[in-house]
Amino acid sequence: MKVLVTGGLGFIGSHTVVELQNEGFEVVVIDNLSNTSLAVLDGIQAITGKVPAFEKLDLRDKEKVQDFFRRHQDIDGVIHFAASKAVGESVENPLLYYENNINALVYILQELQKKSTANIIFSSSCTVYGQAEKMPITEDLSVQTAMSPYGNTKQIGEEIIADTTKVTNINAILLRYFNPIGSHPSAEIGELPLGVPQNLVPFITQTGIGLRQELSVYGDDYPTPDGTAIRDYIHVVDLAKAHVIAVQRLLNKKNQAKVETFNLGTGTGSSVLEVIRAFEKVSGQKLPYKIVARREGDITEAYANTDKANTVLGWKAQSTLEEAMASAWKWEQKIRS
């Protein structure tokens, strides 16, 4: 079976490519390299012994997307990661997010609808829930008004897919991630932000390694036990394995609806300060940090109820927060050595 992975050299994408190849899939990767590098291919090869087929392609270029699918008519499924993904940046540059995250999806769906049957796994986000009215978050909670343009693009993306599946032969699984962290245990691939990191853990590890003087903690006045925001931090390898299970479900026609939705998290919320303490424990060092104002678009807390994924997919996150932080630290040390 051949699977296309868009954004397949990115953080989650590269780990998913590894798991797909480990399960025997033929993988084709496209990426525009805007937030990653070709060196990731070497890491994938080091882990799996195989380099996936790769094309540099910007999914905002409709003609190039059309040409790609003309040349790859034997693709059985698509896992669509390619997107801009930072809440804060999306507030500052919303049009970039609508262009990257909506146009690319539409162009892919336009090509998939030409096929007699097509399957897509969509990289969605817990941001679609906004500040949910109850915790933990279940899939049947109503989607709230988005707190950021990034979150809005994920809501719109889900709606576009749902509308499209009603009138085409496309089947879809929407995977709502919570907060992916960590790296492959081999430290051959990991999170590699170009420029200033947009996520907490790379900021922590870069501060720990000495690239940054101190970590900025955005807000300590949230209504949480220690005042800092709470998120559900899931090891990226656990997340990647869920994608393999999801694509197998579609390819084996085990899906029970044209569109299925699953939360992917650990089911446990951790505050920013708890993540810092986990890093300090695994690294053996004290992390310098300062409290600064909240970021626009950030919510108080979000953690998953994963019963549906556990029961229907037979998937459950395995790694602890400390294990994820240890793998992230191992990766940071390797790339700076």
Tell where the protein language model's regions lie, with residue ranges:
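N-terminal Rossmann-like NAD(P) cofactor-binding module of classical short-chain dehydrogenase/reductase
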Residues: 76-79, 121
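Rossmann-fold NAD(P)-dependent oxidoreductase module
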Residues: 15, 19, 111, 160, ...
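C-terminal substrate-binding subdomain of Rossmann-fold SDR/epimerase-dehydratase oxidoreductases
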Residues: 203, 209-337
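Conserved NAD(P)H cofactor-binding loop of Rossmann-fold oxidoreductase domains
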Residues: 82-85, 124
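N-terminal Rossmann/SDR dinucleotide-binding element
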Residues: 1-77, 196
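Acidic/polar helix N-cap motif
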Residues: 60-61, 93, 305, 320
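Catalytic helix-loop patch of NAD(P)-dependent Rossmann-fold dehydrogenases
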Residues: 92-95, 99-107, 119, 128-174, ...
